[in-house]
A protein has these predicted regions:
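Intrinsically disordered, low-complexity regulatory segments
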Residues: 1-164, 168
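Histidine-centered active-site/metal-ligand motif
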Residues: 44, 192, 206
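Short, amphipathic alpha-helical segments that act as regulatory/interfacial helices
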Residues: 114, 118, 196, 200-203
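Short coil/turn segments at secondary-structure boundaries
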Residues: 153-160, 177-184, 213
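Short amphipathic alpha-helical "interface-anchor" segments enriched in bulky aromatics
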Residues: 162, 166-170, 191-196
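Charge-patterned, long linear interaction tracts outside catalytic cores
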Residues: 176-201
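Conserved small/polar residues in nucleotide/adenosyl-binding loops
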Residues: 205-211
Length: 214
């Protein structure tokens, strides 16, 4: 019997989907039934590696090493997520699985979460996209009746990779630069720093009032 592997973004969503499509038999890390295997990520299972993964010397924050500009991105697996990632890789390679459904959240970040796992596993099996904005049973059924080709969302994945890379480049380099220059850890980020500038556009106003003796 062949199966379609469905990968959600989190366990609660996977359970909701499984209940609708009939995957009602619980296994270790996934559910099976009615021609489906339903499993899940736990947020990001792969994260951009820290600078020292590119060169050992980057473990120490030095002005001379800036800017740090990786030619190719490297990814790391958080220790607490290795088991689930290994399971997803095994399911993708399972000979009974003939296609995969990306059922992560309908958005840029959800696309990134799934695609990184799909690529890490070296999966070449056909991939479709479940794109829904509601977790109501009717919406899930409608979504599975109208799955989209995975390639329709290639540009969304590219945008997510660019966003993550921009955050890394600005966050790593700017944080190290200002921290080294001022001798104290100063966190700088692509979103955080402009937001702070909007909230506090100039230095606080200092008022000097003369004292009057009565």
């Amino acid at each position: 019997m062949s199966y379609q592997l469905v990968i959600a973004e989190k366990p609660s969503v996977a359970r909701s989907i499984a209940g609708v499509i009939g995957a009602d038999k619980k296994q270790d890390g996934y559910m099976v039934g009615n021609g489906y295997l339903v499993s899940w990520c736990v947020g990001h299972l792969l994260e951009l590696a820290q600078p020292e993964a590119y060169k050992e010397q980057y473990a120490k924050w030095r002005y001379e090493d800036l800017p740090i500009l990786p030619e190719n991105w490297k990814y790391e697996v958080p220790k607490d997520k290795k088991t689930q990632l290994a399971l997803l890789c095994r399911l993708m390679k399972d000979k009974r699985v003939d296609s995969v459904v990306c059922a992560t959240d309908a958005g840029r970040e959800g696309e990134l979460i799934f695609r990184l796992v799909y690529e890490y596993a070296g999966c070449k099996k056909p991939m479709e996209r479940l794109w829904i904005s509601s977790m109501e049973d009717a919406a899930i059924r409608e979504g599975f009746d109208h799955l989209h080709p995975g390639s329709d969302y290639d540009k969304l994945y590219d945008a997510a990779v660019c966003r993550a890379g921009a955050d890394w480049l600005i966050g790593i380099n700017a944080t190290r630069l200002f921290s080294v220059l001022y001798g104290v850890t100063l966190n700088v980020g692509r979103v955080m720093s402009p937001t702070l500038a909007l909230l506090v556009p100039v230095s606080y106003t200092h008022l000097t009032l003369p004292t009057i003796r009565l």
